């Protein structure tokens, strides 16, 4: 079955209301009707649910966009790409719930479509069926993130933001957890990576004009001023939109390796920079240090040949891991396809933080004391630390995953993970 058919089948099942509610400690999934409502047991306090703990998972399924009022699929044989991330995340969620069910985990899980026209996020968060929720997991956009963070703070329950790499202006909220590390954290990590591995090499940051690029430069400048180690001497070079290799070589040294930081999140800029540096790598040896968005770039293309590239990511799926192999085999056997990164993200976040909730016992205790527990690791070595934006008053603003993996590639092949 091709991926399109697989997702279409999943959409049909979701539109029929299947598995949007799950009592994980039972032997079956509760089948829902086409109204996609939640179970009446959600109105009861946790004690009435025989000790089960209530989890709310928010993700963009776009069911109302994909199906009309009669549950007819709107896109014929096509499958719009904007639906993929939410459905892939949902697949991982379902696999995690299967694993938790096998462990007899006492959970009461509710899944909400953040793109629902009849049940918007704000309405869900204030609804009777949301009452008693002890953990929020969300694949979100900024507006939704702020709503969920606000409710989490009011109810003293943790909210795990699994995808959005920004605090969205949220402060003074110890219930808010960012898993996808912020841009500043990536800059700090890349800076330390260069300090640790290339302390004597010349460093050049190539950038283009732009507000985002100014922010990146400000981060590196601030890190240079506050580092406890010997600061890097970064040379900043602003390039025109139509630059080529000749605009770069004057900043390179033919007698030693130059560390070239790509000071922009623009993927087109990244491709142009890598291609230009690759075209002169017989004369100028360089290591290109890129941004977290580079995971989406195909570096196997011939124009990048021979160029060493390093970029940071907070999520790394080790292909040698037994659970990873098991999930890959499941997808190969059942769907004739490979699981995406979002499948692993869905599995990891739901399994890990549900286990932490069960370990703590819920009841408004939060997860703060167990966020760093290594025994709950699934794929990623999360390093979830408190963030204090104002060091003068030391108010805890939120928690953030500070663990970064540094992926080194040559000709598109991973040659090292640090």
PLM features: what roles do these ranges have?
Residues 77-109:
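Signal peptide-proximal N-terminal region
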Residues 131-141, 159-162, 202-208, 255-273, ...:
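Periplasmic-binding protein-like
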Residues 137-139, 144-206, 210-220, 298:
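Extracytoplasmic ligand/sensor domains, especially the bilobed periplasmic-binding protein
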